[in-house]
């Protein structure tokens, strides 16, 4: 018998571009022995030659992911490491503006987030500006239901003077206030002063910051908690990709949100209403008999063809099939808009793995963010900062669920003009009639 496995957690690394997310992740993996010396030497020489030595750890990460894009981490990449207590999968969320929707699909799979902020003068402030991704990513993480947060205050070696306790306290106060406003319990959030480049306070404590007596980053990871698995709810698996594998057949890939999937089960793919039987299930190239919430799986199905299912579909139980919305009512927060939003506005809604344009058919009420009470019925328009109850009509078939029933399928982001316009939670659904083709 193999030793019992450590519990598994998915973690997303978020924060403003160039604040050090990839360097921090690469350095942690390097220190935990995940790279062979040959690769390290090669990358060191390469980065020195190009005069970009400070990219060394980030490049190690890129090499590992085989994506040496022009200094920008694009697709979501999955990496694993273990601590004393847990087995982690890191979802390295890209930091550039136009990748927020990757961040949305990535964040919806995470149990916890590390928010990386730069302590360097001007850089922290840029991340907290109206256009800043520190703000945007924190708001998204909160909406996506990530309740556990670790803040890494990076580049402490580059403050004025270096390792400044005053600067650390200033950032902790500004960011703490902001996170509290989002509904986070700030007393539970560690704010860890680090240098991703020198490795200080990643694994061992830094002698340069004797004023700090909290946990190192890796110690803080071990204080995270495994969220309870919603195994008693009906099965829901948002589909990320579908493959046709020779000798096996059709293999949809996705993460189990709720319920349990077993070999031999019959399930239904919505919105198409197609029924299939599960032949095999795999996770990380290992065959398993059943999959539970949090498992990233590929499962071979009989009874459907690759062309019948696509990213954004949801596989679910036949008894309680996933809901296809004719219309849905949601509470939204407008994060950014240059003018105003009125009835008829049609942003793209990103929910679980789907992205579908949805038209606002009614603005029911404006809400006071502090009390949650209604302050205006049927306002003519909404502007940046407003919270409101609105009705949406999807332009094409879309699976959504009430946030109170299935969190991962009931929270969404609204995108337009390459930006995140707002975020929301589904309150009520008027279901569309779908014939299930048994």
Swiss-Prot record:
Domain tr-type G: 6-229
PANTHER family (UniProt xref): TRANSLATION FACTOR (PTHR23115)
Sequence segments annotated as region (G3): 92-95
CDD domains per record: EF1_alpha, EF1_alpha_II, EF1_alpha_III
Gene Ontology molecular-function annotations: GTP binding; GTPase activity; translation elongation factor activity
SUPFAM superfamilies: EF-Tu/eEF-1alpha/eIF2-gamma C-terminal domain, P-loop containing nucleoside triphosphate hydrolases, Translation proteins
Protein's name according to its UniProt entry: Elongation factor 1-alpha
Gene3D superfamilies tied to this protein: P-loop containing nucleotide triphosphate hydrolases (3.40.50.300), Translation factors (2.40.30.10)
GO cellular component: cytoplasm
Top-level division of the source organism's lineage: Archaea
């Amino acid at each position: 018998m193999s030793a019992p496995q450590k519990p598994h957690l998915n973690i997303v690394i978020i924060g403003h571009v160039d604040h050090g997310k990839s360097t921090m992740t690469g350095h942690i993996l390097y220190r935990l022995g995940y790279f062979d010396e040959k690769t390290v030497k090669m990358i060191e020489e390469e980065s020195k030659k190009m005069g970009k030595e400070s990219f060394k750890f980030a490049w190690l990460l890129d090499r590992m992911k085989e994506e040496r894009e022009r200094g920008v981490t694009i697709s979501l990449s999955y990496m694993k490491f273990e601590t004393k207590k847990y087995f982690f999968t890191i979802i390295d969320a890209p930091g550039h503006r136009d990748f927020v929707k990757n961040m949305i699909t990535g964040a919806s799979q995470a149990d916890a987030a590390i928010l990386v902020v730069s302590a360097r003068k001007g850089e922290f402030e840029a991340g907290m500006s109206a256009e800043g991704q520190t703000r945007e990513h924190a708001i998204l993480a909160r909406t996506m239901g990530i309740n556990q947060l670790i803040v890494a205050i990076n580049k402490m070696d580059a403050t004025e003077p270096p390792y400044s306790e005053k600067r650390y306290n200033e950032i902790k106060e500004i960011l703490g206030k902001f996170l509290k406003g989002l509904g986070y319990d700030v007393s539970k959030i560690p704010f860890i002063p680090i240098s991703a480049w020198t490795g200080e306070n990643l694994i061992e404590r830094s002698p340069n910051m004797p004023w700090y007596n909290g946990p190192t980053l890796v110690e803080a990871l071990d204080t995270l908690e495994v969220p309870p698995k919603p195994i008693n709810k009906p099965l829901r698996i948002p589909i990320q990709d579908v493959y046709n594998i020779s000798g096996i057949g059709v293999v949809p890939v996705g993460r189990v949100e709720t319920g349990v999937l077993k070999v031999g089960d019959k399930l239904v793919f919505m919105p198409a209403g197609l029924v299939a039987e599960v032949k095999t299930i795999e996770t990380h190239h290992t065959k398993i008999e059943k999959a539970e919430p949090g498992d990233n799986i590929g499962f071979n199905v009989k009874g459907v063809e690759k062309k019948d299912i696509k990213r954004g579909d949801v596989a679910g139980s036949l008894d309680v099939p996933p809901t296809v919305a004719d219309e849905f009512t949601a509470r939204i927060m407008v994060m950014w808009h240059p003018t105003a939003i009125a009835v008829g506005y049609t942003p793209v809604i990103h929910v679980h793995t789907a992205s579908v344009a949805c038209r606002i058919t009614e603005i029911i009420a404006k809400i006071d963010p502090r009390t949650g009470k209604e302050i205006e019925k049927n306002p003519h328009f909404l502007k940046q900062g407003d919270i409101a109850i609105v009705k949406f009509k999807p332009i094409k078939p879309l699976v959504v669920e009430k946030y109170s029933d299935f969190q991962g399928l009931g929270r969404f982001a609204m995108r337009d003009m390459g930006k995140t316009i707002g975020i929301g939670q589904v309150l009520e659904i008027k279901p569309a009639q779908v014939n299930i083709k048994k």
